[in-house]
Regions:
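Beta-sheet-rich sandwich/jelly-roll-like modules and their strand-loop junctions
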Residues: 1-74, 102-109, 115-170
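Short loop/turn segments at connectors of secondary-structure elements within structured domains
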Residues: 45, 56-59, 90, 106, ...
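Beta-strand secondary-structure signal
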Residues: 48-50, 61, 95, 111-113, ...
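Short proline/glycine- and polar residue-rich coil/turn motifs
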Residues: 84-92, 104
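Short hydrophobic alpha-helix segments
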Residues: 82-83, 205
Length: 238
């Protein structure tokens, strides 16, 4: 992968173990990452997905989900308008560019999910000892998953991860995302919310507007002028 094409690489498979996982049509595998590089001045965009196959003519469907719930990679918000589909003709390592880049904000979790539209063999990493060589794959809970037609299974107990990566790039922006602004609510009244960026208070209706109120629980605000995006602000109950 050329560093000039992609800036950052999200992955978990750290060893050279040539593990092979046989999957049936309809099975899914996923990795959940935490975005680390976005800022108020530069946005981080997922540009491509990389995966390993050990068989030919593997049909796939790729979707990315923002902030999925623990243990359920597909429970988040879909980030691609439609899944990216195709057929991998030969075994090997493959980089698949997305037709449209997907932005992830610093601190967001995002799940890269691949569904096989045909049976196939994919690459995965795990602890292994062949006597003449051994492999150690350090894993944590909530990183890599396999779907068996019924439920998602965390691969951490087996010290395994699927060989699935996300490549991102950085792009300058002239508007600050509200997620990078701090917020406070003085009370349970939506009128009491305060937004500020680097100590500067944002002005309602000039820098942001309230687009949704959920009783006295929270409000959703949307950026205006020099500010972009939306932010959910929970109201104080006491």
């Amino acid at each position: 992968v050329k560093s000039s094409e992609y800036k950052y690489n999200y992955f978990y498979d750290g060893s050279a173990n040539p593990g092979i996982l046989k999957l049936k049509k309809g099975q899914k595998f996923a990795n959940v990452f935490t975005a680390k590089k976005g800022s108020a001045k530069k946005k981080e965009l997922i540009k491509a997905v990389n995966l390993v196959t050990w068989s030919a003519n593997v049909k796939y469907s790729i979707q990315i989900y923002r902030n999925p719930k623990d243990g359920r990679p597909t429970s988040g918000t879909k980030m691609l308008k439609r899944p990216v589909t195709g057929t991998i003709r030969e075994a090997g390592t493959h980089t698949i560019d997305l037709p449209r880049k997907a932005e992830v904000l610093r601190g967001d979790k995002f799940a890269v999910v691949v569904k096989l539209r045909s049976s196939g063999k994919i690459g995965f990493d795990e602890n292994d000892d062949y006597h003449w060589v051994s492999f150690v794959n350090k894993t944590k809970k909530g990183q890599s998953y396999l779907y068996d037609h019924r439920k998602w299974n965390d691969l951490n107990p087996d010290h395994a991860t699927v060989r699935l990566k996300a490549y991102t790039v950085m792009q300058p922006v002239n508007k600050i995302h509200l997620r990078y602004c701090k917020a406070d609510s003085k009370n349970k009244n939506p009128k009491g919310i305060v937004l500020y960026y680097k100590g500067k208070h944002l002005k309602k209706n000039k820098d942001y507007k309230i687009v949704k109120k959920e009783g006295y629980k929270y409000v959703i605000v949307k950026g205006r002028g020099r500010y972009r995006g939306t932010k959910k602000i929970y109201l104080k109950t006491k």
